[in-house]
Structure formats: structure tokens, C-alpha cells
Amino acid sequence: MDLIILVGIASALLVVILTIFFLQKKKGGTEAKEAAAPPQRGVPLRAQEGVPRRAQIARNQRNRLRQNAPAAAPAAAAALQAADAEGDNDDENPDGDGQRMPQGAVLDEKMGAKKRAKMEAKEQKRLHREQELIDREQRKVKEAKEEAERKQQEDFQEEADRKRAEAERLVKEERERKEHEEYLKMKAGFSVEEEGFEEGDADDQDNLLADFIQYIKDNKVVLLEDLAVAFKLKTQQAIERIQDLQANGTLTGVIDDRGKFIYVSEEELAAVAKFIKQRGRVSIVELAESSNNLINLTPVSAGAGEGSS
């Protein structure tokens, strides 16, 4: 009886030991097969090894571009965001031939030279497009700055022109005011006291001044004493009147040492100046001879009489 029990116990232990042995052997073979099995084709090796994906590398490159071009931030940022989305879509969507773009080491190991060149060209094209966007925005900023500077320069020039015109207007008004004061002073001098006419109204004084000027222009060469007698003035008063008229530009001419005033018109002065300019250096004798031809000293009344005869 005891022998049977011992044999049964020994048999049970043997069965247990054999079962454990076969289980361990089976488990070891499964692990060896799994270790020897190659990685799956659908999962990139770079992803299995923890290497960053292509999209992450592209984002890093775009971040560096953003740091190098801060001036083009507003519009370029939107373009770069669109490029990011496009890059993500490229990662998620297959290429034109229906295959996903290989990543990392798979790109080098499994992609042929032609396919790799195509992918590199595509990447270069994308980077070139992003750089063009940045350059375009920088160019717009530069053009806007130049336009602002040009507008500022135009405003400055307009302000300078306005100030210059204002200064010229003030000078002209001051000159006209002085000429008017000299005219009034000269007109008041024509009112004679004991030797001439009684003082008339303003119209009479204007007419008297106009007659005085016209008398000199008509006679061309006027003896100052005769001029004073004609207008009931003293000789010195007549000389002062002529000097005042010369000062304000009403009369042009010279008073010689014989007591005569020779009237020369603006046109005759211009003709003499033109002659001197054309001839260059001119002697006094040549100038005197030419002046006799350029300056008409014949009285108007005498010239009219000769023309009618």
C-alpha cells in the first residue's frame, strides 16, 4: 500500500516537471522568433528609434527663418502657417504615386536615387517659395519706408516754397508801399506857393505830375531851366523831381554837366546793353558812335513833323 502511494506521488512530480520544462521551452522559442523578426514596413525606422519626423524638422527650419526675418512678420507668418499646414498635409497624405513619403533612414535605404532627388527638389522648392514670401514682405516694407520719406521731403519742399512766396510777397508789398509814399511826396511837391499855381485837388496834382513826365519824354533832351519855367518851379525843385522819378523807376536817363536831362527809354537801354553784350569789349568812342544810332534824341513833336512832311 505504501509503495503504491509513493509511486503515484513520484509519477505526479514527474508530470509536473515535464509540463514546466515544455512550457519554458515553448516560451523561449517564441521570444527568439520575435527578436529575430524584422521591423514592420509600415512604421518608419526613424519613428521606431525616436528620431523627429520630417514635419518637425521643417518646423524647426521655418522657426529659424522667422527669427532671421522679423521685419516681415505679419504677412510672412501667415504664409509660413499655411506652409506648416501644407507640410502636415504632405505628411498625412500620400504622394502622387499613391505612396507615403518615407522618413529618416528609410528615405536613404529604401528610396531610389530618382525618387530621392524628386523629394529633395520638392523640399528645395518649398523653402525657396517661403524665402520669396519673406523677400516680398521685406521689399514692401522698404518701399513703404521710401514712400514715407519721399512724402516727407515733398511736404518739406512745399513748406519751403510757401515760406519763400510769403517772403517775396511781403518784400513786394513793402516796395510798393515805399514807391507809393515817394509818389505822394513827389506829388505834394508840385503844389507851388507864391510863384506858381494855387494848390488844386488830387486830380489836378496827378495830371500835373503826368504832364511833367510826358513833357520830358516828348522832348528827350530837356534844359532844366526851361523845365522849371514850364511848370512854375525852381530849377533845384525840377532837379529834385527828376531824381525822385529816377529813384522809383518812372524815368530813366542822365543829367549832364551842361544842365540838361537826357531821357533814355527802357527799350533804348536794352538795345545798348545788347550791343555791348554782342561786341564784348567796347571802347568809349565806339559806344558813343553806336549810342547815336541806338538812342533817339529827336523830340517827339519834331519827329512827327518830319514824318508828316
UniProtKB/Swiss-Prot annotation:
Instruction: State where composition is biased (Low complexity).
Output: 53-84
What are the protein's UniProt keywords? Endoplasmic reticulum, Membrane, Transmembrane, Transmembrane helix, Ubl conjugation pathway
InterPro entries, per database record: DDRGK_dom-contain (IPR019153), DDRGK_domain-containing (IPR050899), WH-like_DNA-bd_sf (IPR036388), WH_DNA-bd_sf (IPR036390)
List membrane-spanning regions. 3-23
Q: Which residues lie on this side of the membrane: Lumenal?
A: 1-2
Q: Where is this region: Disordered?
A: 30-178
Record's compositionally biased regions (Basic and acidic residues) = 107-178
Q: Where is the composition biased (Acidic residues)?
A: 85-95
Give the bilayer topology: Single-pass membrane protein
State if Transmembrane helix is listed as a keyword: yes
Stretches assigned to the Cytoplasmic side: 24-309
Entry superkingdom: Eukaryota
Q: Name one GO cellular component term.
A: endoplasmic reticulum membrane
* UniProt record similarity statement: Belongs to the DDRGK1 family.
Which proteins does it associate with, and in what oligomeric form? Interacts with Atg9; the interaction is transient.
Protein name per UniProt? DDRGK domain-containing protein 1
Question: Encoded by which gene?
Answer: Ddrgk1
